[in-house]
């Protein structure tokens, strides 16, 4: 069977791996000049690796880890200390420290009860809310708890948290930075389902809250091994190939896709296959679907109710080590990297999470004779979309120095700003109902992408899981697809 996949992000590539392993022929068509989708990265003219986000691998990314192991990329992950670190104004560090003698759920209870990010009043309120949450049920009935959590999609996390005895202090100091890091929106705007899904996994599984980051850039250490695995098995990648139109035919009342009209910048051609997968993000799928499908099928019309959130990713290079707060000599020398080697959160800046990539992912980001390369995610990104890159860089620099007063005498030597007006889908309350399944009303047309139905959030894991589910839907209908192709010949 021949399958054409539109989109070479993680969802598209995960779909391809499953299909190729089952013995099928796959081609991927990507409109951009690089693969990877929202996890994509590239090298600029000066040799700097540029990313569109800060990519952290939680221990509960089981599907992504399985994919990475299969293609030989799992060894490219660097394990971080089992603690979630918050940097507050003035350089005060707060932690959710999951390191403990025993595993889940006790390490999680210890982390939240002893966190230095919250004062005593906030910790008590936080404990009350968590103690009355579905997370407790999940310790003995994981599937039942997950069903309860799915039903909480109708309300925001803040609404749920406050109704259970939580307080505003906990939301502001701890939960908002985490929500921004996960979904690019705060706890008043993110679904309770989204947040509680993550923390259900954290509570039930010791490894779920462990953090890892890539050895270097996503292109070199994640996408390249997947691409090589697929190409070694006959898969073809076509970048700069934009789908202009989906061709269809109605036979005996059934609509089927008969081809894709694709432009490569030089010529337009028609690609045919037995099955077609649209592995797009939300704006991509809205642009791809034929307009008449909206009126003909409510399944497709629901997709247009999904919205996205803007985000800006900023990289700042320094002439010293910004997160080394204790030793001035180490901070200013450039012979060795020093500082906080982990994902960092903050509630005191316009960026919710950040990391020094020269420490966390040194293969492509550490440069001899240079210092920190901070990568920071500005959320919500709305205020920055019309601002100049230079203004954004210096605005962020000022906030970095407020978090790290010890770095006041360090200089920014280079910056990059990447804006995405439409990034993750907005996981607002009530939106789960509009997420489509991977199988569609059109028998030979399938969807993949982290916005589609899958039991996780919009993330690298969600994208990978959606791709696996799309492939499973195709394989489950293989006989029907091949019969239809023979009948049309």
Curated annotation (Swiss-Prot):
Molecular function GO terms recorded: 9,9'-di-cis-zeta-carotene desaturase activity; oxidoreductase activity
Keywords carried by this UniProt record: Carotenoid biosynthesis, FAD, Flavoprotein, NAD, Oxidoreductase
Enzyme class: oxidoreductase
Domain of life of the source: Bacteria
GO-annotated biological processes: carotenoid biosynthetic process
Metabolic or biological pathway: Carotenoid biosynthesis; lycopene biosynthesis
EC number(s) per entry: 1.3.5.6
Keyword Nucleotide-binding in record: no
Cofactor(s) the record lists: NAD(+); NADP(+); FAD
UniProt catalytic activity: 9,9'-di-cis-zeta-carotene + 2 a quinone = 7,7',9,9'-tetra-cis-lycopene + 2 a quinol
Coiled coil: none
Family according to the record: Belongs to the zeta carotene desaturase family.
Function statement: Catalyzes the conversion of zeta-carotene to lycopene via the intermediary of neurosporene.
Protein name listed in UniProt: Zeta-carotene desaturase
Gene that encodes it: crtQ
């Amino acid at each position: 069977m021949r399958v054409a996949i539109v989109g070479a992000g993680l969802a598209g590539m995960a779909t391809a791996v499953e299909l190729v392993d089952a013995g099928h022929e796959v081609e991927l068509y990507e409109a951009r000049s690089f693969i990877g989708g929202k996890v994509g990265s590239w090298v600029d003219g000066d040799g700097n690796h540029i990313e569109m986000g800060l990519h952290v691998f939680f221990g509960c990314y089981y599907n992504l880890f399985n994919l990475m192991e299969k293609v030989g990329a799992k060894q490219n992950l660097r394990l971080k200390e089992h603690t979630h670190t918050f940097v507050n104004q003035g350089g005060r560090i707060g932690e959710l420290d999951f390191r403990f003698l025993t595993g889940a759920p006790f390490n999680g209870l210890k982390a939240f009860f002893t966190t230095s990010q919250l004062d005593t009043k906030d910790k008590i309120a936080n404990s009350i809310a968590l103690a009355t949450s579905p997370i407790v049920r999940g310790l003995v009935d994981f599937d039942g708890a997950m069903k309860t959590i799915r039903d909480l999609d109708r309300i925001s996390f803040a609404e749920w948290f406050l109704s259970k005895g939580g307080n505003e202090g906990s939301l502001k100091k701890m939960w908002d930075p985490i929500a921004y890091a996960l979904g690019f929106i705060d706890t008043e705007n993110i679904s309770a389902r989204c947040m509680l899904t993550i923390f259900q996994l954290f509570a039930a599984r010791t490894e779920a809250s462990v953090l890892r980051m890539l050895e270097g850039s996503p292109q070199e250490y994640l996408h390249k091994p997947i691409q090589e695995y697929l190409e070694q098995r006959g898969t073809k990648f076509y970048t700069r190939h934009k789908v202009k139109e989906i061709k269809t035919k109605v036979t005996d009342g059934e609509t089927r896709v008969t081809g894709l009209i694709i432009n490569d910048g030089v010529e337009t051609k028609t690609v045919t296959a037995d099955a077609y997968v649209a592995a797009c993000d939300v704006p991509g799928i809205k642009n791809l679907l034929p307009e008449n499908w909206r009126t003909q099928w409510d399944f497709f019309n629901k997709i247009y109710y999904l919205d996205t959130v803007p985000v800006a990713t900023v990289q700042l290079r320094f002439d010293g080590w910004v997160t080394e707060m204790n030793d001035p000599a180490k901070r200013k020398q450039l012979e060795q990297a020093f500082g906080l080697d982990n994902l960092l959160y903050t509630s005191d800046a316009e960026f919710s999470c950040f990391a020094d990539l020269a420490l966390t992912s040194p293969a492509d980001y550490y440069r001899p004779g240079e210092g920190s390369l901070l990568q920071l995610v500005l959320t919500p990104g709305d205020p920055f979309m019309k601002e100049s890159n230079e203004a954004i860089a210096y605005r962020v620099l000022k906030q970095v120095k407020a978090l790290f007063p010890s770095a006041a005498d360090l200089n920014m030597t280079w910056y990059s700003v990447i804006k995405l007006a439409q990034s993750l889908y907005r996981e607002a309350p009530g939106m789960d109902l509009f997420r489509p399944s991977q199988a569609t009303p059109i028998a030979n047309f399938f969807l993949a992408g982290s916005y589609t139905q899958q039991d996780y959030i919009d993330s690298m894991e969600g994208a990978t899981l959606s791709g696996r589910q799309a492939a499973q839907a195709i394989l489950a209908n293989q006989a029907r697809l091949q019969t239809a192709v023979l009948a049309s010949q």
